[in-house]
Amino acid sequence: MASGDTKTSVKHAHPCAERLSLQQEEGEAEDYCTPGAFELERLFWKGSPQYTHVNEVWPRLHVGDEATALDRYGLQKAGFTHVLNAAHGRWNVDTGPDYYRDMAIEYHGVEADDVPTFDLSIFFYSAAAFIDSALQDDHSKILVHCAMGRSRSATLVLAYLMIHKNMTLVDAIQQVAKNRCVLPNRGFLKQLRELDKQLVKQRRQAGPGAGELGL
């Protein structure tokens, strides 16, 4: 193949993705812009191949599946104190607070469908607040789950890290994906991108050391 043909076949990365390493090295948000969906999906693909029933993705914060949530004995033995069900409801993972009523577990349900048209963003802040409140106690341990532990639950954990840990979407994806194989659907990725843009804008306006924003 001629060199000219080779050049024309090269696909250039999203311009925002080219800035990611620079932003990470400098610890600055000034050069950061939210990557497109394809570039974000590539970050998930580069992540951990681990896909067990449950994985710790942040200290005392675990993402898991339906089997983990239904295993009352396993939850108690593992020391879980909080459960966030991102697939709450009769036609999803039908647990609820009554399922754990005789256990020392605090429950929070989000009735969400794993389809691109579902607006999960309306639950971002309430779910993030529940996770953050749980982790205020050094002895607590929270499970965030859906049916498979890949899309709905992962999306809410990413939103938590962005809102309460001041991470960009890229930082949050890298943190979660290095510990568990996850991949939110395209609709949820779009909603996370919008959250990322809002938070980055707010942090730039607030300046350094502003702490948690968007609350």
Swiss-Prot record:
GO terms for molecular function: MAP kinase phosphatase activity; protein homodimerization activity; protein serine/threonine phosphatase activity; protein tyrosine phosphatase activity; protein tyrosine/serine/threonine phosphatase activity. It is found in: Cytoplasm; Nucleus. Gene3D superfamilies: Protein tyrosine phosphatase superfamily. Pfam families: DSPc (PF00782). Residues 53-201 form the Tyrosine-protein phosphatase domain. Its main location: cytoplasm. Keywords: Cytoplasm, Hydrolase, Nucleus, Protein phosphatase. GO terms for cellular component: cytoplasm; nucleus; protein-containing complex. Belongs to the protein-tyrosine phosphatase family. Non-receptor class dual specificity subfamily. PANTHER family: AGAP008228-PA (PTHR45682), DUAL SPECIFICITY PHOSPHATASE 29 (PTHR45682:SF6). This is Dual specificity phosphatase 29. It comes from Rattus norvegicus. The gene is Dusp29.
